[in-house]
Every structure is written in C-alpha cells, then in structure tokens.
UniProtKB/Swiss-Prot annotation:
Recorded superkingdom: Eukaryota
Protein name: Chitobiosyldiphosphodolichol beta-mannosyltransferase
Tagged with keyword Iron: no
Topological relation to the membrane, as annotated: Single-pass membrane protein
Gene name, Swiss-Prot/TrEMBL: ALG1
Family according to the record: Belongs to the glycosyltransferase group 1 family.
Length: 447
C-alpha cells in the first residue's frame, strides 16, 4: 500500500493526467515538427512532376505564375536538361531534383523506388499549403500525395494533362481489361476523388471527370494550355534570313534553300505510340514522288523534328534509308531557350498527336500559335476546341491527307495568308490571363 495513497487512483485518471501533461509537448514540439517544419511566412506550394522539368512547359508556367502571385514555390521533378534561367534566378522558386529510375528490373521495382523517393521528398517538404501534381503519370505519385494531404493540412490540386490508364492501355494493344490497365484505372478513379481541386486542359476532360469519375464540377476549372511569353511571332522589322544564321540553326540550312519560296516545317515529339511520326515521313515520301512525276515546281521543304523518345531510332532509320531530293529532315534536341527561337523562324508547325484518351490537346500547337505559326494537325474530335479548319490551321486523318495539306500549304498563298492571320490572332491568347481566371474560379487566388 502506497504511503501517499496513489494505489487508490483509478487508471483512467492516470491516463487523463498523462494526456494533460503531454498536450503542451504535442502542441508545441511534435505538431510543429510534423506539419510546420520549414514553414514559410508565404503561402507555400509544392509543384511536382515525374518528368523532365526543362521539358515540362506547363509545370514551369505554373511555377512562374504562383511565384508572381506571391507563393513560395517548391518545384520538384527530373533535371535531365537545362532549366530556364528565369526559373533558376527566381527567389520564390526552389528546385528539388528527383532521381530517375529505369525499368530494367521491372515496373514494380521502379514504382517502389520512385515511391520511397517521393515519400522522402514529401516528408522534407511537409509544411506546404498546397500540392500540385501533373497527371499522368499516376502511379505511384497520386496515392502517395493523397495520403500526405490526408495527414497534413495541404490541399491537393491535380493538373490533368491526360488520363494515365489510357496511356498504359495503348501499351497493351487497347486491352482495358488487362490486369495492369484495370489496376491503373481503379487507382486513378479512386484517388482522384480525394483531391481538393482539379485543372483540365479541355472542356471535354472536365465533362469526363464529372460523368465518369463522379467528381464535383465545382472543384474543376478548365485551364487551356497557352504559350509563355518566350513564344512570340517575328516582328515585321526582324530579318528572318539573318536570324537563320544563328549558331544553333545555321548548319542545318541547305545552301540551295531559298526562304522566299521554300518552306520550313517544325514538329516536336516524344516519339511515343500516340504520335506516329512515320505518318509525316510517309507524306514527305509522297511529296517527293509528286515532285518527280507531276510537278517540278514544288518548293523545297526543310523539316525540323525536335524531341527524344522510345521510337526515335526507328524513325531516324526510316529517314536515313530513303533517298531525298526535295525534302530535308533534321532531328534536333534543343534547349528551352532555343526552341522558341526556332519556332518563330518556321512557316508551319505540324502535330501528329492523337491523344490516348481523346480528351487532351497538344501543348506544341499552343507554342506554335504563340509563335504565329499556322498548324497542320492530325484530327480527332476534341481538337475543335483549339484548331479550326482553314481558319488557323489544316487537319488531316492519314498520310495522304497530310500530303494534300502540304501541297495546299506550300502552293496556295491565299490559304497560307488566311491561316497565318488566324495563327497570329491566336498568339494574343496568353497563359497568365487564363491561369488567373482558372485559379480564381477555384478560389485558390483572388484577383
């Protein structure tokens, strides 16, 4: 028996006393450490993409815009290429590079390694107010982000570029019921519902999320891709011929090339199945045949193909194995500073993007419009939200229709001038205005 009578104190009272004594420690030590470590006086947002930051323009636009709005921006992704100088010099933006893992040991091992790395990154940056992630990719980042936002005070924003499961579905010959595709769909469908806000690149994608995923439409804002300020048309006073002699491009211009009549085309690609560059190469072969057999007045075409990807080697071989006369194809990998310089020097942009989901729009078309380039693009239904036939571009369904569009574009000056005017009108639609409108609609910022 205790001298002080402590033995008579009930257990529940001991527990109450322990909780009482521990509360200050939890409130002033544990909670700040868990949720406020590194807390900024500014509103803080983590923007993350499982992709190369230097070639993720929309993510970089988000970073610039949030910084301009007064946010402290934590920008995370792969650093495989140069990041624009203005991003590096921005005091409101801090970059957190992620290590890139290959899939040599299988997709599961890759996902596990990525997951551990992401958990470490989220823990380090646990005091953020918002998390914005690009989707796709969905796995493993979306489930992890949902867990983080559930146990912290961060609000989750998903920026929908496409649907992750549809990209995986293409790899399995459009078999939706393939176990991996079905799993990817369920992960996307389930975890998307936990996000606080959603941004989509088209109205069609917003409709899909509402009707198929059951997401509240009030949580979704359409934010069309728009070109950044670095994309701008040539001015009338600019000397295009002199600009084509810049170091990054001069060596690719043939000596016999006449810029007064010959045409420069450009396309950017990630050399993936949803963007069949062989269609463009096939149309150029038909163009060569047309020159040889029917029309020796056809102008020369110089086409720049920029980008990297899994099918690149196959396409390069197709070009190397053909004997070209009227067409010259060059493969480039440009810095984020040189790419806009190239676009404004071209006559036409080409897009082979078809969309695995049929719900997204190619960013490259917006960059081309921003540079005053009319576009020739592979048609699919949602493209009507951006490109109007014979107004700001030309559409095609296969390589023969693309060949016809090439002939129109290089031979019919009236067509060229009409769609050029349309592209110049589109060049006035800019990112900042669209971004402010969408984020204000969701009440993330206040104009």
């Amino acid at each position: 028996m205790s001298v002080f009578g402590f033995d008579n104190i009930p257990t529940w009272l001991w527990w109450l006393l322990a909780i009482y004594l521990a509360t200050p420690f939890v409130l002033y030590v544990v909670q700040p450490y868990l949720f406020y470590e590194g807390k900024s006086t500014k509103t803080r947002i983590l923007i993350v993409v499982l992709g190369d930051l230097g070639h993720s323009p929309r993510i970089l636009y988000h970073a610039r815009s949030f910084s301009k709005a007064g946010f402290q921006v934590e920008l995370s992704g792969y650093v495989d290429s140069d990041i624009p100088t203005d991003i590096l010099d921005d005091d409101n933006i801090e970059i957190h590079g992620l290590k890139k893992y290959g899939s040599e040991k299988g997709l599961l091992v890759k996902a596990l390694k990525q997951g551990l790395q992401l958990c470490s990154m989220f823990w380090k940056l646990r005091a953020v107010d918002y998390i914005l992630l690009q989707n796709p990719p969905t796995i493993p980042i979306l489930p992890i982000a949902v867990v983080v936002k559930t146990f912290s005070r961060a609000k989750l924003i998903i920026d929908w570029h496409n649907l992750g499961y549809t990209i995986l579905q293409m790899k399995f010959k459009d078999q939706f019921l393939h176990p991996l595709v079905l799993l990817a769909y369920l992960i996307e469908w389930i975890f998307a519902k936990f996000a606080n806000y959603h941004l989509t690149v088209t109205k069609a994608m917003k409709t899909y999320l509402v009707e198929k995923f059951g997401i509240d439409g009030k949580k979704i804002a359409v934010l069309y891709d728009r070109p950044g300020k670095q994309f701008s048309p040539l001015k009338e006073a600019d000397d295009r011929e002199a600009l084509l002699k810049q170091e990054f491009i001069a060596k690719y211009i043939p000596k016999e090339f006449d810029i007064s009549k010959d045409k420069i085309f450009v396309t950017s690609t990630s050399f993936t199945p949803d963007e069949d560059i062989s269609v463009l190469i096939g149309s150029f072969k038909i163009y060569e045949n047309s020159f040889q057999k029917f029309d020796q007045t056809l102008p020369r075409i110089l086409c720049f193909i920029t980008g990297k990807g899994p099918l690149q080697e196959k396409i390069v071989k197709q070009v190397q194995d053909f004997k070209w006369d009227r067409v010259q194809v060059e493969f480039l990998w440009l810095s984020s500073e040189d790419y806009p310089k190239l676009l404004r020097l071209c006559d036409y942009g080409v897009s082979l993007h078809t969309s695995s989901s049929g719900l997204d729009l190619p960013m490259k078309i917006l960059d081309m419009f921003g540079s005053g380039l009319p576009v020739i693009c592979m048609n699919y239904p949602v493209l009507d939200e951006l490109v109007q036939q014979n107004v700001n571009g030309l559409k095609f369904a296969d390589r023969r229709e693309l060949h016809e569009a090439l002939i129109f574009s290089v031979k019919d000056e009236q067509v060229h001038q009409e769609i050029k005017r349309g592209a110049l009108r589109e060049s006035k639609n800019r990112w900042n205005e669209s971004w402010e409108s969408a984020l204000s609609e969701l009440k993330i910022i206040h104009k």
